[in-house]
Every structure is written in C-alpha cells, then in structure tokens.
C-alpha cells in the first residue's frame, strides 16, 4: 500500500514538473525575444554613431550581454576578426547553429536574425538602421504571440500534463 502511494505521488509530482517545464519554456522564449530586441537596439545605436565596425559591435554586445546571445555574438566577432574563415555569410552560416541550440527561439525568429545580420555591412548606415528597425518591429509582433502562447498554451500544457498524470494514476491503481 505504501508503495502504491509513493508511486502515485511520484507520477503526479513528475507530471506536474513536466508541465511546469513546458510552461517555463514558453516564458523563456518570450524573455529571450525581448533580450534579442534589446540587443538589436544596442546594435542600432552603435551603428548610428558610425565609429564601430561590425566586428567591434558584435564584440561589445558579446561582452555586455550575459544572456544566451553572448556566445553567438562573441563567435561572430571572432569570425570577423580572423581572416581565414571567410565572408560574413560563411561566418553566419557557421554560427547560426548556436542560436538554434542555445535558445528557445522558433525558426522564424532565427531566420529574422539571420537575414538581418546577412544584410548588415552591405549597405549604408541608414539602410542598416531601417533593417534593424524592421526586424525589431517583427520581433515585437512575435513577443505578442509569445505572450498569448504563455497564457494559452503554456498554462494549458501545465494543467493538461498534471491531469494526465492523475488520470494515469487512477487507471493504474
């Protein structure tokens, strides 16, 4: 009887923790998109001064930022610094996997960042600032979607997985 009670408690507890983990993934994605918007605003300000190269901007952002994007921007800066890697597109192709692995960003957000960085350095400063502004606006739309996802999907999965755990306990015992 005690083993049954312990198993029931374990199943309900683990199902609750799984639901909580899914909910926190939605919250983390929302937070990471907001961090990315903040980083892009810093890049836009640095570009507007016109005194920094992309390498220096990426290095500064990588140094300032302690979020998941720090490694990506430091790696981009290092790639631009060393001559043997290649063009910006090749460096970006090598490093975009960092965003896919280390963040909860969806492919559409990663594509936004990919397109933006690929176009940086290929035009004048005003065009680059407009591209950054456009990317920020698109990401702000994604933040409203992620906020809805938190309240709808995140809470739904949290409750659903807990009730599935309770249901499994009822069926098994």
Model-derived segments and spans:
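Juxtamembrane/interface alpha-helical elements of multi-pass membrane proteins
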Residues: 3, 7-81
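Bilayer-spanning, highly hydrophobic alpha-helical transmembrane segments
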Residues: 7-18, 145-173
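Short alpha-helix boundary/capping motifs
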Residues: 25, 64, 71-75, 86, ...
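Membrane-interface, cytosolic juxtamembrane amphipathic helix immediately N-terminal to a transmembrane helix
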Residues: 28, 119-162
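Solvent-exposed, charged/polar functional surfaces in cytosolic regulatory/catalytic domains
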Residues: 42, 98, 138, 142
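Glycine- and small-hydrophobic-enriched helix-loop-helix hairpins
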Residues: 46, 51-126
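Short, highly charged low-complexity linear segments
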Residues: 73-81, 100-101, 134-137, 148-158, ...
């Amino acid at each position: 009887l005690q083993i049954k009670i312990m198993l029931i408690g374990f199943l309900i507890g683990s199902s609750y923790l799984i639901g909580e983990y899914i909910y926190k993934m939605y919250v983390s994605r929302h937070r990471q998109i907001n961090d990315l918007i903040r980083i892009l605003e810093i890049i836009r300000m640095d570009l507007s001064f016109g005194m920094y190269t992309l390498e220096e901007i990426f290095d500064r952002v990588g140094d300032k930022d302690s979020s998941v994007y720090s490694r990506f921007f430091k790696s981009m800066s290092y790639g631009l610094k060393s001559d043997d890697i290649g063009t910006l597109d090749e460096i970006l192709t090598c490093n975009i996997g960092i965003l896919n692995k280390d963040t909860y960003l969806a492919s559409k957000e990663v594509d936004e960042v990919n397109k933006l960085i690929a176009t940086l350095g290929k035009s004048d400063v005003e065009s680059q600032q407009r591209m950054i502004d456009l990317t920020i606006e698109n990401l702000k739309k994604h933040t409203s979607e992620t906020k809805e996802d938190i309240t709808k999907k995140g809470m739904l999965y949290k409750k659903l997985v807990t009730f599935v755990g309770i249901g499994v306990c009822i069926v098994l015992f």
